[in-house]
């Protein structure tokens, strides 16, 4: 039998969650707003080639099964900019008799140049259990930041807001990895 030790933080505190969700996973811009960014090269592709790939992907995002009212809000082929206004569901858990999900709204902006893609996810806002006493509407800064969505020791996800942080990071990772893979082909 092999015994493996639980992963720990530098302070020696045992981790209760995957490190990808812990301290520093949610980034803030200079204005203190939650903002996720990705920059990638595109295997030598021109700005026009990258634009077409990204436009097709971002158009497809608006047709996703969890889509509520997402749309491509801005296209500028000359400047190589595409912006989506996203409105979709993040499903936390689902069974035959229950569904736990939140509506998330955000902007997804792609800035493209030759051999380069910069993607930004910003202005995140949640609408949870609308019309119920346990429901709320709030910006990501009050829901998924380190101070709010992590335990005091920062070694796990907080009970209430941890699921929002995990769901948001998973969605961001999915979009960023899929689009990076497409432009690098």
Annotate each language-model stretch with its function.
Residues 2-185:
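Ser/Thr-rich, low-complexity intrinsically disordered terminal regions
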């Amino acid at each position: 039998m092999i015994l493996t030790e639980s992963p720990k933080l530098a302070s020696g505190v045992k981790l209760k969650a995957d490190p990808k969700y812990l301290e520093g996973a949610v980034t803030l811009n200079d204005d203190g707003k939650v903002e996720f960014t990705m920059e990638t090269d595109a295997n030598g592709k021109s700005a026009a080639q990258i634009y077409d790939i990204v436009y097709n992907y971002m158009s497809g995002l608006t047709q996703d099964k969890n889509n509520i009212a997402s749309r491509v809000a801005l296209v500028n082929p000359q400047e190589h900019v595409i912006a989506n206004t996203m409105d979709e569901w993040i499903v936390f858990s689902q069974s035959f008799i229950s569904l736990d999900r939140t509506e998330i709204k955000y902007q997804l902006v792609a800035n493209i140049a030759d051999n380069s893609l910069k993607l930004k996810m910003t202005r995140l806002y949640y609408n949870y259990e609308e019309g119920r006493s346990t429901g709320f509407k709030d910006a990501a800064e009050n829901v998924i930041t380190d101070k709010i969505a992590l335990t005091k020791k920062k070694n796990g996800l907080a009970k209430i807001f941890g699921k929002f942080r995990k769901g948001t990071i998973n969605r961001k990772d999915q979009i960023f990895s899929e689009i990076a893979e497409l432009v690098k082909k």
